[in-house]
């Protein structure tokens, strides 16, 4: 008898806590209204370099395929020089050089060992919006997608529909 009363009291307490939690719940951030596919066209600015971008919810920071990474100093700060290449539907390759200040460095650890990468700010267009976001730089030549969009950027862009691709047409004019 005592055991039944104890479990009934526990059930009532838990029920009131859950109801109170549901009643008092407010989202911590507004829900983005746009929906995008798990792969979208993106444009690196300046230069209007268009490439396929994979929405990578497993990565916190976005990553860009960068060739010829060359660190250097400017005004006592760490900078990096690199090239970004794109290939259009006719297999024409376009390349553009960039110089960016290194805002931080990250060390990634995986099955292949330790990988140190510079992080820079880059402007990117997805759909009709331009975002200035942090990107790790790495030669991703062996990877299918030259551009990975991480969770920090996805939070600004919208929700991902994993059953769709190329939902948002590029409409940036900068």
What is each model feature region?
Residues 6-16:
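Bacterial N-terminal signal peptides
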């Amino acid at each position: 008898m005592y055991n039944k009363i104890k479990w009934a009291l526990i059930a009532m307490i838990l029920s009131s806590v859950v109801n109170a939690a549901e009643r008092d719940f407010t989202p911590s951030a507004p829900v983005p209204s746009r929906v995008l596919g798990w792969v979208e066209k993106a444009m690196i600015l300046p230069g209007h370099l268009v490439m396929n971008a994979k929405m990578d919810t497993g990565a916190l920071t976005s990553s860009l395929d960068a060739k010829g990474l060359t660190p250097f100093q400017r005004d006592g700060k760490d900078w990096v020089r690199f090239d970004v290449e794109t290939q259009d539907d006719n297999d024409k390759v376009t390349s553009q050089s960039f110089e960016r200040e290194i805002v931080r460095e990250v060390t990634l650890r995986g099955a292949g060992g330790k990988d140190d990468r510079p992080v820079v700010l880059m402007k990117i267009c997805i759909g009709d919006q331009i975002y200035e976001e942090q990107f790790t730089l790495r030669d991703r030549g062996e990877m299918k997608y030259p551009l990975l969009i991480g969770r920090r950027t996805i939070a600004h862009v919208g929700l991902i529909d994993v059953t769709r691709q190329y939902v948002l047409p590029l409409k940036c004019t900068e």
